[in-house]
Amino acid sequence: DIALNRSLDGGLTWQPTQIILDKKNWGNLPEKFNGISDACILVDECTGTIYVAGLWMHGVLDNNTGKWIDNLSENSTTWNHQWLFKGSQPGTGIKETSQFLITHSTDDGKTWSEPQNITGQTKNAEWWLYAPAPGHGITLKDGTLVFPTQGRDRHGVPFSNITYSKDGGKTWTASNPAYTNTTECMAVELNDGSIMLNMRDNRNKGNTSVNGRRICTTQDMGQTWTEHPTSRKALIEPTCMASLHKHVYSRKKEKKSILLF
């Protein structure tokens, strides 16, 4: 499940944990076969609406065949992972592939909507998997909402990209992959209006010579991507998720910004 804690005093104290994404015993399967992971939070800076995305895995697909396994019960020990083997497959159906869910709150996180399943409108049916990237999304200067996202292509190879909404979260669009064999990522809007995507590069696993974050930019909402000059050079990583944040501040009445990794 995906949980959330709220603080009303700047982080001095925290309210009890709320469960905000939970499919319970959906489809008459035990809760352990309705897990939700990879939470990503996004605040619409125009309306104050808070969005949280998560990846729902219903049931289990066979490691070798990728087919749905019937007759699962609380005592079943069968297990698979959406990023391993054939744990998530092409298609958009609930018994074919993991599902991309989004819930939202319009009262500062007190209550949350029933989740919207955007798998059908965003996932390329050839892709094996489409998922949020853990972390946070952003609101662009023009009001566009952007989630950092990730997936597995038609060959099962991972990629990173973005998913965005230009109508206040009513509909969502998936961009083209920014780079192959990358996964968890974070996005920022640069001062020129382009989007920078900072990505985990799985080529770095076990590699101690070249071990930096893959970095790409786009000026057309991810239709095309350009590798940044600092890609795999500036930011060292242990092949894991990481955060990128644009901090905007004023100095001598002049608006400035810095990127924090």
Residue ranges and their predicted role:
Residues 1-261:
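Asp-box/BNR beta-propeller blade signature and adjacent active/binding-site loops
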